[in-house]
């Protein structure tokens, strides 16, 4: 069936062997994959679609018009609605409330189905793939209501098939041939590492178990495909600041996570009021991760509008309320970095910030000293927040021992030989709870090369694109690396790894900068950058 040329580092990928008339079939296949060979505008402005999948789609609509009538008008109306919704100020509030109301009412499945339906609608009728990212984050938050029984959600497999079909339609209608933006080679290396991890050690049953495949494929090949899909639309002209929209998605995801934590305490208010100590819930480390990477996004908007400092305070307080020690330690460090970021971005307000900082420093420290022992009383062991017998120490040593057992490929992401030490919730692998130990123990030297390559690509990209906006992305990435030192973090495919992939695709499209610009003037004026 010919060949599809992937424009990336000069490689040509042949998907199918040649048969019949290669030239003709190749031409048709390229027309299908490259449905739009020039930048397009929003859905409401697409009037000249005349080739590839788009032309075939128009013919289908014309056929339906003849048989049913009004199909083309209906599709055009749906495209207009999707486009207006994505670009409106109602997008985030509507998506947020769509799930929040039903979760508060104890009907998370209903809210999840509504969010998934919105995601499918946007895939079919919106040409901007970024529009589905916040619904994906919301769907991950639905899982907090089923944290002990995630497999029970498999009964909704049918709506997943509908979403997959909608994704294929979206790819055919809107995507173009992707190009490497700077991170692809590192992602290919990670894909190889996750697939080869455990070679010569892990059993066939463990390697091909559904949970193991979810992580080995989800962290590698699936993220690579997600990167290529995002890159296929990255060069299209937009009429909004894409970097700012990505920060809004991180910000909104953090706010919704804060809502989920607050909802838990509302449901268990009587128990909390007994001693004012944080309560245990199994998804606290996942919540801490989402809150932590959202802090820099909130700080970015606080640098523009001081009202967003309330959100910064809310996110940090919810980090404390998770009861996660990682949230306390890394959250405090990130809060200080975010405040320094706001200070740096507003030279005209620095004198005011210095006065506020000096006045509030002692009360803030005193408040933390008073609150932390009470809030984290349930986490204390012999008066210490971190016990020398903590399982994380055991797992770090175990990761090094597993690396010694099979230094080239490690023991594999799906290996269960450490289950007697610690076994997580249903649907999770046996974590080492440390980024370095996870790479060494699960993937060996191949993993070191893969993740080291990806880390180098991303850091180099952030340095080359450095600006006030990309500094916020750099802080979010740093937050993800921090939380990964004590928790799964970046080794959770959905939504953690996916958010990082989408974030760096946005960074790739930022202009190169020789130095970090300091914007002088009104801090309320946003820095506008377009693809």
Report each predicted region and the residues it spans.
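N-terminal signal-anchor transmembrane segment
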Residues: 34-35, 58-172, 199-201, 480
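Aromatic-anchored transmembrane helix interface
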Residues: 156-167, 183-201, 207-232, 245
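A juxtamembrane structural motif centered on a specific transmembrane helix
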Residues: 6-11, 16, 26-91, 304-305, ...
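Transmembrane alpha-helices of multi-pass inner-membrane enzymes
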Residues: 95-100, 293-296, 335, 472-485, ...
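Long extracytoplasmic/lumenal interhelical loops at the membrane interface
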Residues: 382-397, 401-405, 409-443
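Flexible juxtamembrane loops connecting transmembrane helices in multi-pass membrane enzymes
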Residues: 275-280, 350-353, 366-398, 418-421
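Hydrophobic transmembrane alpha-helices and their immediate junctions
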Residues: 307, 443-481
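Alpha-helical transmembrane segments of multi-pass inner-membrane proteins
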Residues: 241-271, 281-344, 453, 457
């Amino acid at each position: 069936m010919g060949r599809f040329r992937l424009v990336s580092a000069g490689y040509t990928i042949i998907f199918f062997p040649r048969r019949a008339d290669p030239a003709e079939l190749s031409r048709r296949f390229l027309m299908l994959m490259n449905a739009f060979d020039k930048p397009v505008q929003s859905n409401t402005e697409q009037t000249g679609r005349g080739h590839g999948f788009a032309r075939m789609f128009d013919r289908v609509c014309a056929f339906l018009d003849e048989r049913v009538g009004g199909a083309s008008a209906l599709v055009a109306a749906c495209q207009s609605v999707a486009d207006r919704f994505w670009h409106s100020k109602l997008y985030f509030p509507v998506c947020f409330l769509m799930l929040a109301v039903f979760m508060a009412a104890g009907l998370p499945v209903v809210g999840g189905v509504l969010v998934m339906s919105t995601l499918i609608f946007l895939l079919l009728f919106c040409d901007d793939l970024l529009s589905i990212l916040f619904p994906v984050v919301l769907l991950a938050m639905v899982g907090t209501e089923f944290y002990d029984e995630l497999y029970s959600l498999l009964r909704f497999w049918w709506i997943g098939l509908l979403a997959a079909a909608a994704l294929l339609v979206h790819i055919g209608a809107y995507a173009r041939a992707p190009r490497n933006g700077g991170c692809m080679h590192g992602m290919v290396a990670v894909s190889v590492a996750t697939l080869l991890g455990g070679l010569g050690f892990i059993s066939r049953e463990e390697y091909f178990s559904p949970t193991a495949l979810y992580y080995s494929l989800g962290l590698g090949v699936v993220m690579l495909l997600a990167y290529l899909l995002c890159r296929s639309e990255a060069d299209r002209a937009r009429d909004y600041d894409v970097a700012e929209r990505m920060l809004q998605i991180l910000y909104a995801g953090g706010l919704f996570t804060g809502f989920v934590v607050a909802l838990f305490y509302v449901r268990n208010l009587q128990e909390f009021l007994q001693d004012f100590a944080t309560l245990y819930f199994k998804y606290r480390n996942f919540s801490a991760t989402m809150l932590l990477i959202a802090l820099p996004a909130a700080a970015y908007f606080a640098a523009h509008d001081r009202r967003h400092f309330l959100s910064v305070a809310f996110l940090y307080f919810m980090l404390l309320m998770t009861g996660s020690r990682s949230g306390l330690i890394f959250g405090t460090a990130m809060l200080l970095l975010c405040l320094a970021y706001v200070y740096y971005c507003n030279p005209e307000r620095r004198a005011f910030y210095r006065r506020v900082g000096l006045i509030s420093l002692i009360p803030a420290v005193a408040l933390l000293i008073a609150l932390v022992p009470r809030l984290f009383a349930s986490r204390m062991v012999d008066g210490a927040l971190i016990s020398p017998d903590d399982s994380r120490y055991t797992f770090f040593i175990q990761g090094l021992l597993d690396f010694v057992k099979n230094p080239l490929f490690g023991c594999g992401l799906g290996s269960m030989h450490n289950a007697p030490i610690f076994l997580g919730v249903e649907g999770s692998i046996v974590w080492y709870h440390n980024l370095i130990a996870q790479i060494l123990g699960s993937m060996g030297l191949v993993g070191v090369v893969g993740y080291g390559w990806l880390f180098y690509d991303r850091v180099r990209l952030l340095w080359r694109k450095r600006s006030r906006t990309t500094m916020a992305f750099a802080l979010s990435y740093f937050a993800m690396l921090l939380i990964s030192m004590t928790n799964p973090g970046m080794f959770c495919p959905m939504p953690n790894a996916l958010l990082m992939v989408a974030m760096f695709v946005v960074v790739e499209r930022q202009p190169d900068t020789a130095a970090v610009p300091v914007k002088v003037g009104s801090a309320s004026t946003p820095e506008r950058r377009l693809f």
